[in-house]
A protein has these predicted regions:
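Core of compact, soluble alpha-helical bundle domains
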Residues: 1-117
């Protein structure tokens, strides 16, 4: 296990997580048409901005997700795979922080999409 303190570790997290997503029966269809060579660097920048404060990400993540047919089950599975990936590969304060941030993002997105009771 390693800490989650550098861009290379964030890239490992993102790559490992999306490898799981691509194999997941519930989530894979949502990502079937993703341009991975373009999408992965965007995700590296997003999480590096969140965890390292490097401000490499510019964009509106919510806007990108609005047209998708998302349900609470999608968010639950996304979080399950994300947390599993973190727990299998990383330890320390940043590992806990990234899981908390993912939970917060999922909560806000579901609220904005009217997917919460």
């Amino acid at each position: 296990m390693q800490a989650l303190n550098s861009r290379s570790e964030i890239e490992l997290l993102v790559n490992t997580f999306y490898d799981k997503v691509k194999q997941d029966p519930l989530l894979a269809p949502l990502f079937a048409h993703v341009d991975w060579p373009h999408h992965l660097p965007v995700m590296y920048n997003f999480w590096a901005s969140m965890l390292l404060g490097d401000r490499s990400y510019t964009g509106n993540p919510f806007q990108k997700h609005m047209p998708l047919p998302l349900t609470p089950m999608h968010f639950s599975r996304w979080l399950e795979l994300f947390n599993q990936t973190v727990d299998e590969n990383f330890t320390g304060a940043k590992a806990e922080e990234v899981k908390a941030r993912a939970q917060s993002i999922a909560t806000v997105f579901q609220f904005k999409l009217n997917l919460t009771p």
